[in-house]
Amino acid sequence: MRLSLSSQEMELVRKFLGREPKEEEWLVVDALWSEHCSYKSSKIFLRSFPSEGERVVMGIEDWQDAGALDVGDGWAVVLKLESHNHPSAIDPFNGAATGIGGIIRDIISKGARPIALLDMIRVGNLNNSRNRWLLKNIIAGIGFYGNSIGVPVVAGELAFDETYNDNPLVDVAGLGVVKKDKIVPSVVKEAGLKIVLVGLTGLDGLGGASFASRKLSGEDEIGAVQIADPFAGKIVLDVTLQIADKVEAIKDLGGGGLVVGITEMANGLGVEVELDKIPLRVKDLTPGEILVSETQERMVFAVKPERVKEVCEAFEYYEYPCAVIGEFTNDTSIRFLYKGKEVVNLPSSLLLNPPRYKWGVKKTKYSVYYEKPNINLEVAVKEILSYPDLVSKFWAYSQFDYEVGTSTVLKPGEADSGLISLPNGKLLAIKGDANPDLCAEDSYECGRYIVAEAYRNLATVGAKGIGVVDHLQFGDPKKPEVYYQFVEAVRGIAEASKYFGTPIVGGKVSFYNENKEGKPIKPTPLVVMAGLVQDKFLRPKITEGASIIMIGFTREEMGGSLLAKIFGNYGDVPKTRLNEELLSSELVIKAINDGKIIFAKDISKGGLVGALLPILVRGFGVSIDTNLIPSDTDDVISKLFSENGGRFIVLSEREDDINWLESQSRGIYVSKIGEVTREQYVMWLREGKKIDLTKEVNNYHRYLEEVTSD
């Protein structure tokens, strides 16, 4: 019996009960007290997140499977962000596929129909054959499940760094729609309701919550990875939505399996469950295996006795297993029986109140180098534009059916944000952002930066952010420097979210992301922001002769930038100036609404040069006068590659549009810095440089397909 509980925690349990727990009871406590389910090392700090707002229908609430935001006309969007990092490191196909399945079940547990997915993937450098194997199978797993179940992938991220060599990050966000008055809770409020389980229970995913709450130890943990079955998942999706108004609560059986799902659903009430009534995929499972199995495509419903028959008949019509396995009781005891014998009897007060930890912190010593490396300008441009993080993701997106369901407005990769249509006719933009290189330098500024970047990304299509879900991914929280990075990232995310008025309605924390030598990954907090188009949306367009206009002010803040990663760090990290971020984003949205611009791109990874790449790869050239870039430095390298926030590149076809932008700027810098040329794949710089980027553009289109062809 392998547990994630510490010896001190085991002693706490013994003292609370006044006895030695049975083996099955240890499994129950281990699942509910796991880091994965209890947030025991993070919850103290997560309380600083803003979770209330005029659009919040369901925020960060205990045991709710997803958050919800009001989008008008009686409709709500349901948001959830999850990961399957540890499973994907062992079995990338099933790890990624079941991550998609889990997020979809979280959405339908609120009675919402899933309409969009995002995937944010980080693996090690692709010169390593195992990393290529991981990437190919992760993408294949996502496509297998998403395509089979009919939910489009509308946006995402794909990035590479040696920090993820042993521990890839596979984040999936889901979005669904539901009438506000039809949202189903995940917890019960009364005793006497029947517990109805659908789906078969097998051996896969045994102890998955405990597995995700400790360091990876090797491929011998394959049994902790769940097996995906999207065709069963499609039945669960359709029938759950069909019977959602006939039940009192719905819960997906995710991390921790049956024991976690039912205990959280009880929300302090008692339960009595007969394990031998559970439909099994494998004969002769032990009670302990049944309790903590994480077999996929299973849901639990709280149902009034008189409605049990119609609920089960709906599933049985498709020959999908459905069974009444117990009921919620008036006491506070969590009881599981097997063939008439009680195998678990634990108080909910023990299970739902794990110890909370506030580990020691040690301030990370951030290095600031003010001596600029000797960098050749042309070499820098070519190195940045060839970097794998910036290449086309079409190889991945082409494996997803991103237009299924008819709600996709912009194809993935077409703009900085995904854009989907809602049932009320409104358009919703959604985007995920992380910046581990910056977080490794300063996790507080990184927390602020990623929220601001997500806000900018939405602005490029004409949308204003309305809410956030987050995922905080770090190493071992007991290591003081790691825990310091976590605490500081939370502080930064909380500050920026409050400032932008984008409450955090859900999230997840994933610790113990380390390589085989125990070295933690770069801190990788991730936010996914949703926003509503305010009036018009912008489909990016590029024309010869269009003016290239920079909105915002460039600063010599090179720390954590892509240039610094390649050539060596220098300068301080970007300081996120929230007022500039807000004003520049509002200016872009207003320009879109008034038809003043035809293209918008936020300046982030790769700086100005990175922001110009979408123009170059569409068969155009650019001419840039670096003297016209508003900046606090004369250093051309900094002007071209700084990644400080609050900045955009926009294109305009009329000269008077520039005057209009200046008149509406409210103190934000607006400057024409160049124009789009017809000379394909060429960048002209004022310094007399004509840089032919044909090779880099070809690399942009072909890199992922070629590197994964082995």
Curated annotation (Swiss-Prot):
The active site is at 36, 84 (proton acceptor). Mg(2+) 1 binds at residue 82. Substrate binds at residues 83-86, 105, 226, 294-296, 510. The keyword Ligase applies. Its EC number is 6.3.5.3. Disulfide bonds: none annotated. One of its GO terms (biological process) is 'de novo' IMP biosynthetic process. Pathway: Purine metabolism; IMP biosynthesis via de novo pathway; 5-amino-1-(5-phospho-D-ribosyl)imidazole from N(2)-formyl-N(1)-(5-phospho-D-ribosyl)glycinamide: step 1/2. It catalyses: N(2)-formyl-N(1)-(5-phospho-beta-D-ribosyl)glycinamide + L-glutamine + ATP + H2O = 2-formamido-N(1)-(5-O-phospho-beta-D-ribosyl)acetamidine + L-glutamate + ADP + phosphate + H(+). GO terms for molecular function: ATP binding; magnesium ion binding; phosphoribosylformylglycinamidine synthase activity. Coiled coil: none annotated. Belongs to the FGAMS family. PANTHER family: PHOSPHORIBOSYLFORMYLGLYCINAMIDINE SYNTHASE SUBUNIT PURL. This is Phosphoribosylformylglycinamidine synthase subunit PurL. It comes from Sulfolobus acidocaldarius (strain ATCC 33909 / DSM 639 / JCM 8929 / NBRC 15157 / NCIMB 11770). The gene is purL.
